[in-house]
């Protein structure tokens, strides 16, 4: 099944929304953990059960966030692949095709930053 450029751009835009929305809950979660740490309510002397809960919550939120982000990037790269097969594309289509390398970099950086944040949390607690 082949799609025209307009359909592919609509799919691209849907994936963009997913990439953004997939980060809302983890951002709120990390903000709450940071607020607890900054106010001294979450530190090395905090009850170990609460620390394990926070670590588990952040880890599971991170896994879901990374999974959603990588899936959206993969779907977006499929759109790029389909756009490249079209005989001609508009400036918008060309811009989307040009975004492919940045998406790959974004995916790699996102995984690294997520891992870094988790390691820092573990070290702090």
Located regions from the model:
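Short membrane-interface loop/juxtamembrane segments of multi-pass integral membrane proteins
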Residues: 4, 8-15, 80-104
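Cytoplasmic juxtamembrane interface segments
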Residues: 35-55, 91-103
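Charged, low-complexity, helix-prone segments enriched in Lys/Glu/Asp/Gln
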Residues: 14-29, 65-79, 99, 103
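Juxtamembrane boundary at the C-terminal end of a transmembrane helix
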Residues: 116-125
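Cytosol/matrix-facing amphipathic helices and coiled-coil assembly/linker segments
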Residues: 1-42
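Alpha-helical transmembrane segments
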Residues: 22-25, 49-63, 102-112
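Core segments of transmembrane alpha-helices
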Residues: 29-34, 108-115
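Short alpha-helical packing/oligomerization segments
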Residues: 42-82
């Amino acid at each position: 099944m082949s799609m025209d450029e307009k359909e592919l751009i609509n799919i691209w835009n849907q994936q963009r929304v997913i990439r953004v929305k997939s980060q809302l809950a983890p951002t709120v979660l990390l903000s709450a953990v940071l607020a607890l740490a900054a106010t001294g309510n979450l530190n090395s002397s905090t009850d170990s059960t609460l620390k394990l809960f926070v670590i588990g919550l952040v880890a599971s939120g991170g896994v879901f966030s990374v999974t959603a982000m990588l899936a959206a990037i993969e779907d977006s790269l499929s759109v790029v692949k389909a756009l490249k097969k079209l005989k001609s594309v508009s400036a918008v289509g060309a811009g989307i095709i040009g975004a492919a390398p940045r998406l790959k970099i974004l995916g790699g950086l996102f995984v690294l930053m997520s891992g870094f944040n988790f390691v820092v949390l573990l070290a702090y607690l």
